[in-house]
């Protein structure tokens, strides 16, 4: 499994439909792609939301981003994350 950080921005339309049931639907999108949600946070600043998810790969991350935007109207910027331990191993001299 790979870790992805999904930064979301509300639109004027998507904010009208905020609900706990839509949050559950968003979690179901990730699960249906073979993933899991590690954390969901509301942010103050450039982005409104941050989802930390595990997904099998890049293709599932792309599908998740598109499906969540279709479901919610929220625009997502999805970035892969690499554990520091893996990074340290990769750059070891």
Where are these regions (language model features)?
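An amphipathic, aromatic/His-enriched active-site/gating alpha helix that lines ligand/cofactor pockets
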Residues: 55-82
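Short S/T/G/P-rich N-terminal loop/turn motif that feeds into the first structured element of a domain
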Residues: 1-25, 31, 36, 47, ...
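Generic structural signal for isolated residues within well-ordered alpha-helices
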Residues: 28-29, 67
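Short beta-strand-to-loop capping motifs
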Residues: 8-10, 51-56
């Amino acid at each position: 499994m790979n870790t992805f950080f999904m930064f979301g921005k509300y639109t004027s339309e998507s904010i009208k439909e905020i609900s706990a049931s839509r949050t559950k639907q968003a979690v179901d999108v990730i699960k249906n792609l073979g993933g899991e949600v590690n954390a969901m946070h509301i942010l103050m600043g450039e982005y409104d939301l941050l989802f930390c998810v595990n997904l099998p790969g890049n293709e599932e991350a792309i599908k998740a981003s598109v499906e969540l935007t279709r479901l919610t109207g929220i625009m997502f910027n999805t970035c892969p994350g690499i554990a520091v331990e893996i990074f340290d191993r990769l750059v070891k001299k």
